[in-house]
Structure formats: C-alpha cells, structure tokens
From Swiss-Prot:
UniProt-listed InterPro entries: RNase_H (IPR050092), RNaseH-like_sf (IPR012337), RNaseH_domain (IPR002156), RNaseH_sf (IPR036397), RNaseHI (IPR022892)
Domain RNase H type-1: 1-140
Cysteine disulfide partners in this protein: none
Compartment(s) where it occurs, according to its Swiss-Prot or TrEMBL record: Cytoplasm
Listed transmembrane segments: none
Residues involved in Mg(2+) 2 binding: 8, 132
Cofactor binding description: Binds 1 Mg(2+) ion per subunit. May bind a second metal ion at a regulatory site, or after substrate binding.
Subunit structure: Monomer.
EC number annotated for this UniProt entry: 3.1.26.4
Coiled-coil region(s): none
Name of the gene encoding the protein in the UniProt record: rnhA
Keyword presence, RNA-binding: no
GO cellular component: cytoplasm
Name recorded for this polypeptide: Ribonuclease H
Length: 143
C-alpha cells in the first residue's frame, strides 16, 4: 500500500510545552493525529510526529514522508547510519541527542520502504500548514 505521511512538531519555548501533528493519506482517505507533551523540545516533537505516523500503519507500506524538519530528514537519510556504526555517538564522540527516539524511529522505518522529503515550513504548503495547526492543537490541549 502507498501512503503519504505529513508530519510537524511545535514547541512554545524550547524546551517547553510541545505538540506534534500527522496527516496520513492512503487509498483516497485521510486520517489526522496529534498530541503533546508538557516539557519537551521542538526536535523531540518532530521525531514524535514521524514515530506516531509510522506507528499508525498496520502493515509494511511504501511511504512518502514529508517534513519541514531538516533535523529529521537529514537524520534519517544521512546521519543515522554513522550514529549506529559509532554506538549512537556523533562526530564529536558525544552521545546522540534524543537517541531513544531515533532508535524507535529507525526500528519503525525498517518495516517500511520510506522516501524522506523535506518541505519548506510556513510557505503555503497546504498539508504542512495542516500538520502545523495539529501540532499547535496538541500544545493547546495540554492546558
């Protein structure tokens, strides 16, 4: 099954209250998801959005995942292989930040065939604007 997933994370303060939003599109249908955490970072919410989107898939899929986070996109396309090879340490030999989320995302990604796409945020991209609003709703619902 071919699936499009659009993801976004948001944070009020960094760290601070954060939210994530997801749009899944498949077989002409759409499903949205959102949530939040009271104390987190923007990067953690970007990762959580991708994790929650992939967790929603019930079987292996062909996935086009769209994010406005270069951290997420480059992490999955470029950096993660080196991190794994180096025991989850970066080029400075420091432990990778958010390693537990990266590991979870890597495990989920291994189930699917994923193309990771970067889109410019806040540029009138319809789906990105929708998941941005969902991420902010995740923050609002915390209070």
């Amino acid at each position: 099954m071919k699936v499009e997933i659009y993801t976004d994370g948001a944070c009020k303060g960094n760290p601070g209250p954060g939210g994530w939003g997801v749009l899944l599109r498949y077989n002409g249908r759409e499903k949205t998801l959102h949530g939040g955490e009271p104390q987190t970072t923007n990067n953690r919410m970007e990762l959580m959005a991708a994790i929650k989107g992939l967790e929603a898939l019930k079987r292996p899929c062909e996935v086009d995942l769209y994010t406005d986070s270069q951290y997420l996109q480059q992490g999955m396309k470029e950096w993660i292989k080196t991190w794994k090879r180096n025991g989850w340490r970066n080029s400075k030999k420091e432990l990778v930040k958010n390693a537990e989320l990266w590991k979870s995302l890597d495990n989920l990604a291994s189930i699917h065939n994923i193309n990771w796409h970067w889109v410019k945020g806040h540029s009138g991209h319809l789906e990105n604007d929708l998941v941005d609003a969902l991420a902010n709703l995740g923050i609002e619902e915390l209070s």
